[in-house]
């Protein structure tokens, strides 16, 4: 079956990840998945939330938002509405959980990395693109901090679904909006599942359909991991000055520049 954009059912959209999009961020990446574009920026601060102080563990958190005209019609900023919507909270927590699956919080030390994921253009799969791009920003932030070993595996995500009775990989908006079943799968580069979110919009799906969707997702995540690795293997983009450390290669970094 050929889809509306010419892809086969098991084909990802064209995906690119460009590092260093925000020169002030310790790590940043712009991910494009078809027409969907998400800017991910990782900010490092010394210290951890009050409830984690003295534990020797770091913290990774995430915030997700969408520009007012990322969609077909304008949406007010949530700051103007005076409250954060439930969908935004849900996606922010999903991104944070997914990234923490990729990191050794003890190796991070008592430092916090906050990842801001801003959707510039939405054409389906914004949360999965955010996770995939945010990992690259996180990895660069750990390098900047002098703690690259804190990254223990990669993590990425992709959507799958059933459209017109046919299982498909990486749904665009027109497919997602008419899907019989919609699912988001988060997977590590080591092969573990972090999260599987699936919903039947109408008729319940069979176990065989679930297995087929997971197979599509695994193949898609394998390809996304390759794209992440290729992006991180490229020469690093210019960023803020690295923090001063006690000794080169000691991995004892963790203090910000004090000017941020």
UniProtKB/Swiss-Prot annotation:
Gene3D superfamilies: GHMP Kinase, N-terminal domain. Residues 232-260 are annotated as: Disordered. One of its GO terms (biological process) is tRNA processing. Keywords: Nucleotidyltransferase, RNA-binding, rRNA processing, Transferase, tRNA processing, tRNA-binding. SUPFAM superfamilies: Ribonuclease PH domain 2-like (SSF55666), Ribosomal protein S5 domain 2-like (SSF54211). NCBIfam families: RNasePH. Phosphorolytic 3'-5' exoribonuclease that plays an important role in tRNA 3'-end maturation. Removes nucleotide residues following the 3'-CCA terminus of tRNAs; can also add nucleotides to the ends of RNA molecules by using nucleoside diphosphates as substrates, but this may not be physiologically important. Probably plays a role in initiation of 16S rRNA degradation (leading to ribosome degradation) during starvation. This is Ribonuclease PH. It comes from Parafrankia sp. (strain EAN1pec). The gene is rph.
